[in-house]
Amino acid sequence: MSNINHAGKLGKECYTATATCLLCPQHCQLRQGQSGRCHARKNYEGEIESLTYGEVAAWNLDPIEKKPLYHFYPGSSIFSAGGFGCNLSCSFCQNHEISQKHQVGRKVTPAELAEMALEAQKSIGLCFTYSEPSMWFEMIRDTAPLVRAQGGKVVLVSNGTISPRFLEALIPWVDAVNIDIKAFSEAFYQHYCGGKLAWVLDNVEPSGGQGPLGDYNAYHPRGQ
């Protein structure tokens, strides 16, 4: 299975042997063969390649409230899966073993992942979580329609650090989103997360009722 994004939609060539990844606002400028700060993408001959397409780092059947979503099919369970990599580097990350490095995960196709989610006992669908799901953009793009076609629900649990146009590309295939706001402080985001609050807030503007159910979770780690 090829991991290469042949369409080149996630990056652009900006000068000789260097490409800029456009998937998130970090806009990593990568030399040939260099990986981004997310550990999930690299420059392959001037285009941005996904290193984690078809690799599952973790999966489980979780209560929907664990996402946490409290107004979306309360009391139900949802099959949850995630790949490797994250575009933030939160010092308090609970899933740092999969978010801060790329290892070899279980190989699955989008069809296989959709089947796992739909066949899990009492699962209402598939939640992309554990690491940052937007780093798994192509896998979500190819898997979510298969889940929805069988009547399943699709959920994202995200840090909100994704370029708005790529989030908009996923929204038609998503039923609910939880954006985890780490703190309402630019200084906190820069010091503890390696990101910017402004990037997140760009993605939590009201959708005017046209998008999926949104939930926003503010998390402030103790002592920081």
Residue spans of the language-model regions?
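Cell-envelope and extracellular/periplasmic
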Residues: 182
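Alpha-helix N-cap and loop-to-helix initiation/capping positions
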Residues: 191-199
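Flexible, acidic/Gly-rich N-terminal and inter-domain linker regions that tether
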Residues: 1-76
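Internal, well-ordered alpha-helical scaffold/interface segments
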Residues: 138, 168, 198-205, 214
